[in-house]
From Swiss-Prot:
Domain Helicase ATP-binding: 48-212
Chain's role: DNA-dependent ATPase required for providing the needed energy to achieve the termination of early transcripts. Acts in concert with the RAP94 subunit of the virion RNA polymerase and the capping enzyme/VTF to catalyze release of UUUUUNU-containing nascent RNA from the elongation complex. NPH-I must bind ssDNA in order to exhibit ATPase activity.
Protein name: Nucleoside triphosphatase I
Residue stretches making up the Helicase C-terminal domain: 378-541
Secretion signal span: none
Ranges spanned by the short sequence motif DEXH box, renumbered to the chain: 150-153
Length: 648
């Protein structure tokens, strides 16, 4: 074990001794009932309150673990450390009433010292700039400051440079650093996913909690490990509290555990029609010409739905384009009103027997071919729904023409019942959600499907879901986790028999007829990001107060505080990565790219990672099957691996 651990362990026990008198209950003044904190909530509160020099902490807890209540408990009892505090709470505007204001009013009588700032509101940030000087001048003389940042990853993402240019939020970020690290002030950050995109976000998060102590670089991560793990860990000791019930990321299957449904992962590789492929190629050219091409916007739209005669926006202004979209939707909606597939056709469709059945109505076959021509994804979605034993969730962020509106036309053709939870259904969605979640609908007999957009990706829960379909990929795993998390909650499946307590997660990956796929591109980006982020999460877990306390639970407490003032002011030495020699065993192979199987290439394979190198540079990664076995073909008695492009 590392040298500093035992000293930090002594300080944790010092804080626990110092705060023995704090109650593990908190009174709800509205209901006049006492709430008992969970052991982990009580533990972290006592450490944060009991250690004066531990001025910063991250609550790295899963969604639903009680971060808000813990923060409110700390607000209530931090006066044990000093009698007068200004409380500054940074949150998303949508979270002001519930949970924050409601929770604070329930447990704290005097809220006059609490100020809210919305980090997603320019007017609220202007308010912060206006009160910044008055807060700064009052510190040390008569008050101390406690800063609380909810969903800190959303704030941090606003600080990361874009195209090497500083973001507008950077001045606010710098002021927060100055206030948080002013003598005797404290900062508490909270997130279930503290890093969502890249290493720069992690550096900025640490820069907020412990300024100038380190700067991690991507080259420190090699083969899924940090080459300077020990140095980083000692710099970050006790920087966070770690509480995650399920550590697997969204792309990893999990078994049923502690009230959480089993998660199965399915990838559906589907081929677009010639018409959809043609429009995709047009969209690709359009994306490359525009400033927002990196967002792959038009390709994503066409991958979902490509109505005939629907052209790329081109030179149309927004009004003209929206009018054209409305007109085309009306045409498509009118066309599908006359389609109502027969029971015999639907049964054959469910079982993938359309091509071999010769007695199906010719009208059904023609209509099916037309619908498939417009969207291979929506056809596959209908097949998954019809084969599901229970209720189905569908994530479709495209609310208008290319998304939910056209998808509902497909459902009508296949007699699939549904509700919609999006920004367009504000007046009806809550009542419909109650009907969908009703006990009598646990098997989806009354309402089979709920289509939801980003409006439903946070803050709501669905019960007894058996399948969730991801029609359009978000850009990072944390958003994906929020989306899938709507269907897998604590005890969300308790009303189903044991054998039905599962959720099948379906990723729809559509390809053109020449194997282009924006879905695959985004999925690969997510996987690459998350591989590095998981290394960071492992570092935070190892540095957490729980990890240290579990080892040194019975060590003699420190007599007074000495260590954290030193830790948070000691900068980790920069590592010269060029001096670090890492030996990797490589094997010569023949391979080809999946999209160009005619060209046979030579390379050196790292069997541990399936990465192929040429001239000391990673150039490709082997494709694997569901059993994690590399895919290959045999040509002229030569084994040839199938690979995708890979960039380090």
């Amino acid at each position: 074990m590392f040298a500093l651990d035992s000293i930090v362990g002594k300080h944790i026990n010092y804080a626990l001794d110092k705060t023995q008198h704090l109650p593990n209950k908190i009174m709800n003044n509205i209901t006049n009932t006492e709430i008992t904190l969970q052991d982990y909530q009580y533990f972290v509160s006592r450490i944060f309150i009991g250690l004066k020099n531990l001025n910063s902490m991250l609550l790295f807890w899963d969604t639903g673990m009680g971060k808000t209540l813990t923060a409110v408990y700390i607000i209530k009892y931090i006066k044990e450390l000093f009698p007068r505090w200004i409380i500054l709470i940074f949150i998303k505007k949508s979270l002001y009433i519930d949970p924050w204001l409601n929770t604070i009013r329930s447990y704290i009588s005097d809220t006059s010292n609490i100020k809210f700032i919305y980090y997603d509101s320019s007017s609220s940030l202007d308010k912060f700039n206006n009160i910044y000087r008055s807060i700064e001048s009052s510190l040390n003389k008569k008050s101390r400051l406690l800063i609380i940042i909810d969903e800190v990853h959303k704030l941090i993402s606003r600080t990361v440079k874009k195209d090497n240019n500083e973001r507008n939020f950077t001045p606010i970020y710098k002021k927060l650093i100055k206030l948080a690290n002013f003598e005797n002030n404290k900062i508490l950050c909270m997130s279930a996913t503290p890093v969502t995109n890249n290493i720069s976000e992690f550096n900025n998060l640490i820069g907020l909690l412990r300024p100038n102590v380190m700067n991690i670089k991507e080259e420190y991560i090699n083969n899924g490990k940090l080459i300077n793990f020990k140095e980083l860990r000692e710099t970050l000791l006790a920087i966070c509290s770690y509480k995650r019930l399920i550590e697997a990321d969204s792309l990893t299957e999990t078994n049923y555990i502690d009230g959480y449904a089993k998660k199965n992962i399915f990838y559906h590789n589907i081929i677009m029609s010639d018409e959809q492929s043609k429009l995709y190629n047009m969209a690709e050219k359009y994306d490359y010409k525009t400033e927002l091409g990196g967002l792959k916007t038009m390709r994503r739209l066409i991958s979902s739905f490509a109505f005939y005669d629907l052209k790329i926006k081109g030179d149309l202004d927004n009004i003209e384009y929206n009018d054209m979209i409305k007109r085309k939707l009306a045409e498509f909606s009118e066309f599908t009103k006359n389609i109502n597939f027969s029971e015999s056709f639907i049964e054959s469709f469910k079982n993938d027997n359309i091509k071999i059945k010769t007695n199906l109505p010719i009208t059904d076959i023609n209509n099916y071919n037309i619908l498939y021509q417009y969207s291979c994804k929506y056809i596959e979605t209908c097949k998954i729904i019809l084969n599901s034993r229970g209720k189905v969730l569908i994530f479709e962020p495209l609310v208008n023409f290319e998304g939910i509106s056209s998808l509902k036309c497909y459902f009508n053709c296949f007699n699939i019942s549904y509700i919609e939870y999006s920004s367009k259904t504000l007046k009806t969605r809550d009542n419909e959600l109650n009907e969908y979640n009703n006990y009598e609908n646990n098997n989806g007999k009354k309402v089979k499907v709920c289509i939801f957009s980003y409006a439903g990706s946070e803050g709501i829960s669905f019960k007894c879901i058996n399948d969730i379909i991801i029609l359009d990929m978000p850009w990072n795993e944390s958003e994906l986790k929020q989306i899938i998390g709507r269907s897998i909650r604590l005890n969300s499946h308790k009303d189903l028999p044991q054998e039905y307590r599962y959720v099948n997660v379906h990723f729809l990956i559509s390809y053109t007829n020449n194997r282009k796929s924006v879905d695959k591109e985004i999925l690969d980006i997510i996987k690459d990001k998350q591989g590095k982020i998981n290394v960071i999460f492992d570092l935070l877990k190892s540095s957490s107060i729980e990890s240290i306390h579990n080892t040194y639970k019975y060590i003699e407490p420190a007599e007074n505080e000495i260590i954290f003032d030193t830790i948070r002011k000691t900068r980790m030495k920069e590592m010269n990565v060029s001096n670090v020699i890492i030996n990797i065993k490589l094997y010569p192979i023949s391979y080809c790219k999946d999209y160009d199987r005619a060209t046979i290439l030579k390379g050196l394979l790292n069997k541990d990672t399936n990465i192929v190198y040429k001239d000391n540079t990673a150039v490709a990664k082997l494709m694997i099957d569901k059993d994690n076995i590399p895919i290959f073909i045999i040509e002229n008695d030569t084994l040839i691996y199938i690979a995708d492009d890979y960039y380090e």
